[in-house]
Amino acid sequence: VCPHFGQCGGCTYQNLPYEEQLAMKESQIKKMMDEAVNGKYVWEGVKPSPVKQAYRNKMEFSFGDEYKDGPIALGMHKRGSFHDIVNVTDCQIVDEDYRKILDCTLEAARESGLLYYHRMKHTGYFRHLLVRKAVKTEEILVDLVTTTETDAQAFLDTWVKKLLELELDGKMAGILHTKN
């Protein structure tokens, strides 16, 4: 069970054992098929995945704060909230490389003193962090999305250096900075 379940809005069924997740999904899919298909069809059921955790190969994390005017956070949106962010340092749907990159980026962002982009005020720098890891090659691509309003080359240089120093299972294939 994911330790962030309940607060984090990223997953729906992480509070259930995998077998219960499968049963629920199978019931939902079977119901949709029954309603969508006219006539008889062969139902083969839902096949379990051999990978039950750390199965995501791409994630987009958001910058924000965990509560109004709180410290900068980097993670997923809180359940039911478009503004508040949950730091997901122990997210179960990504592997350890994602967590290391997430922690490194959050630490560098906090040390920089730069602010997250505040949607209501239209101020700040940090928007999103995208991480992608190829399943077969384990090549990792990281993309930091920021605003264009701040010249933060010193932060970017420090952040890239820290990322390249991480001990990862995968191989860092690219580090991007997207201004948006």
Feature map (PLM): residue ranges:
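Accessory RNA-recognition modules of RNA-modification enzymes
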Residues: 1-180
